[in-house]
Regions:
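Basic, amphipathic alpha-helical bundle interface domains used for macromolecular binding and assembly
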Residues: 189, 200-288
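Walker A/P-loop
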Residues: 33-85
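Canonical AAA+ ATPase core
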Residues: 63-69, 100-104, 119-132, 138-213
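C-terminal engagement/docking regions of AAA+ P-loop ATPases
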Residues: 48-54, 257-376
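Conserved RecA-like P-loop NTPase ATPase core
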Residues: 24, 32, 44, 93, ...
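Conserved NTP-binding/hydrolysis module of P-loop NTPases
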Residues: 80-104
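Conserved alpha-helical scaffold flanking the Walker A/P-loop in AAA+ ATPase domains
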Residues: 30-35, 99-120
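Pre-Walker A (pre-P-loop) alpha-helix and adjacent loop at the N terminus of AAA/AAA+ ATPase modules
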Residues: 4-48
Length: 376
């Protein structure tokens, strides 16, 4: 049994076709797509057993098989996986003398599998020694492997590290700051696990397609300076200058891959680069008073007891959305978010379960979107 769907809606030249037996990993796959599109190292954080490495390997297979010609040899040669602990030596990163060439050709050279790999996975990086971490920095930042006089270019297209947690005493360490893309991989809920059993358990397969925007496609997204100023108000004291230089490009890529408005992309970027609290603070700053008022009315739908009360409230919200969209106060991304919130509330509302008509909302939002300014 399998399910095929597209994670991203926008058209891109590059597409990854992912097949996985994992469930509820769409956000992780999007993060890996973001890492590939931006060329930034990604850190996956989560408890043992949440399938951090398996998710990366499923994505790696999709990347290696993008032309449909992947072989077992490709998988073995183009992926470098390092399991680190306190005893792992820096030579695992820096490379070791190639004894074969030394004895057969009397030639000294380094065997550097990490430099040759197209996908690099460093597991349990929180347990790595300072020597390992220092050796990683050049590979991560400059894409060069430094070993004495040797400076070897690295070929990686996707660099992912995993850890159980970032040690509290190291949260402000420059090493962790190098991972601008951070994502927490959570456990699957008990309810979702039951659904997984009903779908066939370990025999179940999900298939995704996810678009990978190139530089030109990313730059199609326009982020007004006024919105970046709001980001700076929240993020400046939490980020290094180096990290802040990536905010515009990263936010554009987020907008593209998640197919969300610029405001939502900036909020998600803050969540990725800083934390959830920063994202919530930025969301509050980016919302105009008018949009906040509409969102508040949407949340109030929970409190109504009868279908008649809901109908009146919906009509009021629809009127406000039309007015604000016409005046350019609300963009299509915000309208879409309101639509999704309303549909979710109405589909689960006791007074509306037997009466909900999603078509009326979809028709309204479609009409409004055609008349509202394009946020991109």
């Amino acid at each position: 049994m399998s399910k095929v769907k597209s994670i991203t809606k926008r058209t891109t030249q590059e597409v990854r076709q992912i097949e996985t037996s994992l469930i509820n990993k769409e956000e992780v796959f999007k993060m890996l797509a973001l890492a590939e599109a931006t060329g930034l190292p990604c850190l996956l954080i989560g408890a043992p057993g949440v399938a951090k490495t398996k998710t990366v390997l499923d994505y790696a297979k999709a990347w290696l098989n993008r032309d449909g010609k992947m072989t077992a040899k490709d998988f073995a040669e183009k992926i470098y996986i390092l399991e680190t602990d306190e005893g792992t030596k820096a030579s695992e990163i820096k490379g070791m003398p190639d004894l074969g060439k030394l004895f057969t050709d009397n030639e000294y050279s380094l065997s550097t599998p990490i430099a040759d790999a197209e996908i690099v996975i460093i597991n349990e990086v929180d347990k790595a020694s300072s020597a390992i971490r220092n050796a990683m920095l050049g590979v991560m930042n400059e894409k060069f492997l430094f070993n004495g006089k040797h400076k070897i270019p690295c070929k990686w297209k996707l660099f992912v590290a995993t850890c159980n947690e970032i040690p509290k005493e190291e949260k402000n360490s420059p090493f962790w700051d190098r991972f601008m893309l951070k994502h927490t991989v959570n456990r699957v809920s008990a309810g979702e696990m039951i659904k997984y059993y009903n779908k066939g358990g370990r025999e179940y397969r999900e298939k995704f397609t996810i678009g990978i925007p190139n530089k030109a496609e990313i730059n199609e997204v326009d982020i007004p300076v006024t919105k970046l100023e709001k980001y700076m108000e929240v993020g400046y004291n939490h980020s290094s200058d180096r990290t802040l230089t990536f905010v515009p490009t990263l936010s554009k890529a987020v907008s593209y891959i998640w197919d969300i408005s610029v405001d939502k992309a900036l909020v998600k970027t803050a969540q990725i680069m800083i934390d959830q609290t920063a994202g919530s603070e930025l969301q509050n700053k980016l919302m105009s008073p008018e949009v906040k008022a509409v969102m508040s009315k949407v949340e109030m739908l929970h409190s109504y007891q009868t279908n008649e009360q809901l109908e009146l409230a919906i009509a009021e919200i629809e009127g406000l959305v039309n007015t604000y969209a016409t005046r350019g106060i609300m963009d299509s991304g915000q309208i879409n978010e309101i639509e999704i919130s309303m549909q979710y509330i109405l589909q689960n509302h006791p007074a509306r379960v037997d009466n909900v008509d999603n078509n009326e909302l979809e028709e309204l939002m479609s009409e409004v979107e055609t008349s509202s300014p394009n946020p991109f």
